[in-house]
Amino acid sequence: MERIRDDTMKKKLIGLALSAAMLFSVLSVPAFAAVPEESADPALTTEQTAAEEENCFFTSSSTEEEKEPNSITYVALGDSICAGIGLTTVQYAHNLMGVDVSFNFKGYPETCYVGQVGKSLNLDRDHAINLGLPGVMSKDMLELVKTGTMAEMNTLSGCQYNYPEFVDYIKSADIISIQLGSNDAFVPTVVSFGEATNWKSEDLASIVLSGNLRGSSKETEDALNESLKKLSLTRSEKDAVWNLFFSGMNKICENAYPESSSNLRQIVATVKELNPDAQILIIGATNPVPLLPSWSNYFSKLNNYEKQLADVYGATYVSIPFAQTELDGHPTVSGHKYIADKIVKAIEAQQ
């Protein structure tokens, strides 16, 4: 009975997280729009559907001459951004989200930034490992890099990962990237959103989970509009949502920063201790909702802290201010390519 309750809670939290991402999209703009336009990469401004974008990637890839695989090993630690969630080619079972995504460690989509870094460095799937975990918060990753297991379920995100091989992956890597911190603010916001609306999100969550939102079909658009109509809120629920977005988030972000910065420091220190010879890259964050001052302030402080952290531990900070994101808050294929290019440049600069 306890197992059933846990599974139900996980599904509710994961579904709500995706639903809340849609609500945030009302306030979202492409991440690179918040910075000077002349600095933006023109390649990222081309409008394409997700399928067209990924098809272009695979078409261009097939014409290149094959090279001998490199012998170095790249390991990426991160959350759903790292995992490639949102890409049309990502493979995962919804009932295993937050529980077991080990199939994505080597079976990740070629278009995610881990896949594109691997391609640029001529790494096969045994030498480019994607340890991106959807829903993971910095405190969860700290447990995983130390012991390979989460002692208990994260009741906010609904995830509980257990991978004893985590430590071995870190020890065997030549290059390790760390991309974390977004969920420390996002997950508590999601839970607060659910409480404010009395969890009226089932239909919307179903559409988001289908993966069709990155397409452009009228059928998906109509279904989305219908689900939004069903998300009818009472006056008190509307007031609660309003208070969340315009005051509650300030407190959430203020509380998130001390924890995320402390956990990130311990994660980097632990990784450094496990593998002192590895090149460590700390990947900055892109704010998917720059119109919310509380989030902009959180990500600004987090990025500044990560720069300092990199200096202290002899790591490399990789800034990604122009990473294009979709309505679900995750990078597009172009966004992943941009992140990958920045990572590859950082790696090559140290060689």
Give, region by region, the residue ranges found by the protein language model.
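Short, Lys/Arg-enriched N-terminal segments with co-localized hydrophobic residues
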Residues: 1-8
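Sec-dependent signal peptide recognition
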Residues: 11-19
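Bacterial N-terminal signal peptides
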Residues: 19-26
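Short, solvent-exposed loop/turn and secondary-structure capping segments
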Residues: 34, 85-89, 141-143, 187-192
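Serine-esterase "nucleophile elbow" of acetyl-processing enzymes
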Residues: 49-134, 223-225, 332
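Alpha-helical cap/lid subdomain in secreted, periplasmic
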Residues: 154-350
